């Protein structure tokens, strides 16, 4: 984790190293730029070059050992610190149920559960989840025994092309836990969700981070609502 934070800091330094060396702090009594400004940035180009070189070195840091707990199984890996959780799942472990859509955290196709909380796997580094419990769509059910949410998506035709479905299902499973915990959303009146108050608008709000280009939203909402009613 320390290496990751150092990587962020030095990468940012390298990226913005062409910023003006002085900021406008006003003139001193002699009419020259204030001496305060000279302390803001390094005094010579050599120090900037050294910072760039150090940042580049960390961007190509050697592979590090890592243990990921995925769907109840431990995986001991050795990967570069810059590898995202999404790429570790798909490219290293072959768990291709988690989809790469926008790769920018906007579509939700890569949604997985980490310690029960839904996250976008494309926006987080694998190194940040050492030892944590990760659940992908492959871990929700078994062949012939799908998770109730998976079954509901099939029964309600909650998909068309199916590319976004793994992320939709993982997000919907997390939604069930949120409802049980009575967690509020942006639409909830009050600090807690009242029993039986999960409306279609609430479902749409809670699923707004998962996009479907095919437009299967009505059936997705129907599928989620059916599971909530059965578990009530």
Question: Model-derived features: where do they sit?
Answer:
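Short hydrophobic transmembrane-like helices used for membrane targeting/insertion
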Residues: 1, 13, 40-41
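Short, low-complexity intrinsically disordered segments enriched in A/P/G/S/L with frequent Arg
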Residues: 2-5, 19, 26, 30-33
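Leucine-biased recognition of intrinsically disordered, low-complexity hydrophobic segments
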Residues: 7-10, 48
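Amphipathic alpha-helical interaction segments
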Residues: 12, 30-33, 225
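Signature of N-terminal electron-transfer/Fe-S-associated modules in redox systems
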Residues: 22-23, 36-232
């Amino acid at each position: 984790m320390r290496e990751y934070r150092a990587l962020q800091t030095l990468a940012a330094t390298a990226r913005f190293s062409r910023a003006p060396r002085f900021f406008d702090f006003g003139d001193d009594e002699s009419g020259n730029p204030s001496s305060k400004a000279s302390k803001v940035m390094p005094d010579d180009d050599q120090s900037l070059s050294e910072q760039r070189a150090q940042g580049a070195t960390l961007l190509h840091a050697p592979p590090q050992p890592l243990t990921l707990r995925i769907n109840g199984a431990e995986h001991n890996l050795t990967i570069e610190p810059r590898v995202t959780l999404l790429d570790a799942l798909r490219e290293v472990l072959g768990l291709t149920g988690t989809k790469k859509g926008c790769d920018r955290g906007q579509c939700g196709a890569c949604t997985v559960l980490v310690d029960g909380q839904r996250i976008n796997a494309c926006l987080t580094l694998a190194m940040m989840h050492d030892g944590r419990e990760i659940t992908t769509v492959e871990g929700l059910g078994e062949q012939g025994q799908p998770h109730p949410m998976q079954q509901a998506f099939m029964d309600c035709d909650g998909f068309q092309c199916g590319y976004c479905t793994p992320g939709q299902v993982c997000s919907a499973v997390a939604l069930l836990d949120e409802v049980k915990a009575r967690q509020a959303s942006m639409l909830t009146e009050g600090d807690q969700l009242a029993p039986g108050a999960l409306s279609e608008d609430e479902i749409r709000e809670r699923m707004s981070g998962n996009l479907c280009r095919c437009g299967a939203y009505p059936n997705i909402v129907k599928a989620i609502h059916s599971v909530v009613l059965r578990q009530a």
